[in-house]
């Protein structure tokens, strides 16, 4: 099954000259604590993706008005995921929720509540939707479908990710992704990290009787393992490890649980 693809925004031309870019290669390898933080963010991205995927399926069963609810934002509340679908108000002072999908006992189990009239939100969902809008304007015009993700950052801000969406069965795109750090109110970009530059899209193939042992790719922009590398491992089928080589000649393994070890 092809996973969700949700970025129904009109993206504008490139415009990012005043934004702090996180392009500088780190001079020392990431510490175990930094690798653990990357694992945690990657795992949250993977959970977010599963929640948004199945919540979207649940809402689609109601034949929603997509024009009235072009945006979706997910949040983990009390150990369960909640995904809302709606739009910013014309005054841009609140988020109007038309559908709320709540996770049940299983990760893929979602129940949906429809709001008519829409419910107002001036908290997380409002700020997250503003953050998506703010970063999408900076990101610019895209030539392919992308998915957006918003996570709380470790220092009280918001992370906004744009990852390429899956368009072909069995092909899991890696690369061409970016992470923004945005102020908590969603209005200002603090920094932008280009995690990978190019997109690799190929279907893993093995000879009859063989099994895929793992994947491998190298980094040229940063000397770190990226959050989206962990996401890639956790969402790819079959579930196999990934070896990541960095420009400073270090080698890391991302295991199938998302944990990262430095091998060289």
Please provide the spans of the model-predicted regions.
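A short, surface-exposed beta-strand/turn
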Residues: 95-113, 172-190
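Bacterial N-terminal signal peptides that target proteins for export
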Residues: 1-9
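Hydrophobic, aromatic-enriched interface-forming segments
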Residues: 141-182
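Active-site-proximal loop/helix of nucleotide/amide-processing enzymes and allied scaffolds
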Residues: 21-111, 120-156, 201-264
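Charge-rich, low-complexity terminal tails
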Residues: 174-177, 182, 189-194, 249, ...
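N-terminal signal peptide c-region/cleavage motif recognized by signal peptidases
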Residues: 15-17
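Short coil/turn segments at the loop-to-beta-strand junctions that recur within blades
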Residues: 196-199
